[in-house]
Amino acid sequence: MLNSRIYIISFLFLLNSFAFGNLIRPSDGDELNYIHILFEWEQQPDAIGYNLQVSTDEFFNNLILDVDETYTVYIDSDNFNWNDTYYWRVRSIMDCDGCEYGDWIGTSMFSISQSTPPYIDEGVEIESSTDIYQDDLLEDGYVAIGAFSPGPHSFIIDKYGNEIWNSGILLENEGWFSDGFILNHINEYGNISGYSGLNYPYNTGMKANTDMDVVWSTMNPEPVDMHEFKQISNGNYMGFQNVYAVGPIPSDNFMTETFQMLGYQADGVTPEFPWFGQKIVEWNSDHEVVWSWNPFDHFTMDDFDNYGGTWWYSFNEGSHDWMHSNAFHFDEEESVIYVSHRHLSRISKIAYPSGDVIWNMGLPAEYNTGDNNICTDLRFSFQHNIQLVDDGDLLFFDNGNLSEMLLGDSNPTTRIRRIRVIDNSYCETIWEYELPPNLYGSAAGSVQLLDNGNYSIYTIGTGSVIEVTPEQEIIWKHTGNINSAWGWYYRAYKIPSIHPDAFSVIADNYTVDENSNNIIQISGNSLDFTIINKSGYTQPYQFSFGESTDGPPMFDYEEGDFTLGPNESIELSFAVLDGNISSTNINFSIWPVHHDYALKELSYNITTNDTLLGDLNGDGTINVVDIVMLVNIILNGEEYNPVADLNSDGTINVVD
């Protein structure tokens, strides 16, 4: 389940100690919400690789995994099951005479929680189904799904329909105020955003990691709308919140007389009924509102849905859901926001930060949703999931609730539309896909352009996620528990991995000195590290490197950044400034830019090849002269000298 704490996870490796390192994750006693397990441990001295073992018993009599790994991160996607307990350990692979393996670092235990339970209808289990029609055409990866009912919950499946991750199981307090989580966005770096009733309403707009820790949330007493919330490219966060006004009831709607029977004027003029729309809100990292856009300041209440049945809902709910804004795309390059307003069958392009409406795309004037809409020939209706793809096209899910009236369809028809807006005035259709009649989706829905050119589509029609080629061939289909609460999904995303924060750092020449201290022994003119991206995503990284001791520097202080593709590695080299300095201590911090909670803070004791710890006069031997010099350093409080710090605890005292 979700954790209510908000924190940054920092791995602190004190590698200049006597200890040989630790197992990092899973931590001892962890209960995981996924079966693709990421194992991570600290680098071991003189290791050329590592042997990882996992067993179902603490004595390791029943090994389910026995594998060698070059780096300090290993992800297994084949050997683990829901609702089970495991034990794991790691040892070094050595390259020396008579020592193939080092000692076991230790043993940790972890368990895996249960998978999402099946839906039971009158005692009968309703199962989902998954069909692969063209495996060789599929985009590699997994499908992440955010679901509405029986309360907010999310899960990820593989191409066979097997669940590999979930956001936590709803056991009680189901509904919108439960502590469940519905994902509504996963970006290109693997950041998960969505809605949760945990500590309602403070986490109704939140970002989480794979372990469902709350990485960031609005912490706002005003609830965030569940349709879309995400971190935008300027580093801030954006979402919808309801805003209210009083407006008229239309005089020519099929519900007009019903309202009049209750005493309303319903004349299309008199302000007498509560309306609400969705304002766009931007928060900075300190949870402060730094920008907002109120639709009542930019749109006229003369524009409203008069054909889609929204006033029937208004009558029953006691307020009019005027806009039902459900998606936005923030484009920092052009400094605009594209917004989908479902109940107006309208997509707007808004200048940022002025808030001026550049254009509204929607229906012809006779449908009462605006007199100056562009691209009226498209005649889309009740759309979802507007987005701008890399080449500048707009891609969205056209639910088509009004397609019979607008397009002459024989039945309501859902379409995927990829269009290009020309000169902010008219549209060119780049690609269009008409879903089969049984997949018509009157609500929700999403579409994603995949790296291989396919489209991943979710439709509430039969609760299905499909993958479609550019030639409009369905090559994969997952159908939820049909006609059940569990089948009501909201959005789906195809992703390459469930561990977007996974990376490993290896220090060259990491060894042990004659006093059993862990050190890096420089053999040339540079200190070298290898970093490998194990996340499955292309990730940018940042780092800082510097010394933690006073006196003349052995290295320059450096900060920098780089980008790695999936499973790519890079070598970072830091040049030695002064070859006469024989030892120092350095701090090396590195983190994925979009997953800064995965910060690694590394500290090392550095020596050159000819440095003998304790040899204070540099004569190549340790004798009484060095002892006298050490005593004088302690008595006189002289400047820190790493060669005198025999136990590498950062201070020089009688223990040394």
Residue ranges of predicted features:
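Sec-dependent N-terminal signal peptides
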Residues: S4-S17
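Short coil/turn motif common to extracellular beta-sandwich-like domains
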Residues: L32-L38, I522-S526, V625
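Pro/Thr/Ser/Gly-rich low-complexity, intrinsically disordered linker/stalk tracts
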Residues: G21-P45, W82, Y101-E122
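Hydrophobic/tyrosine-rich beta-strand signature of extracellular beta-sandwich/beta-rich modules
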Residues: Y86, V90, F588-I590
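Recognizes extended acidic, P/S/T-rich segments that occur
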Residues: N51-N83, D95-S108
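Surface-exposed, short loops/turns at beta-strand junctions within beta-sandwich domains
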Residues: S77-T85, L577-S582
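Alpha-helical segments with a strong preference for the paired helices of cellulosomal dockerin domains
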Residues: L616-V643, S648-D656
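Histidine-/acidic-rich catalytic cores in large beta-rich domains
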Residues: I105-I606
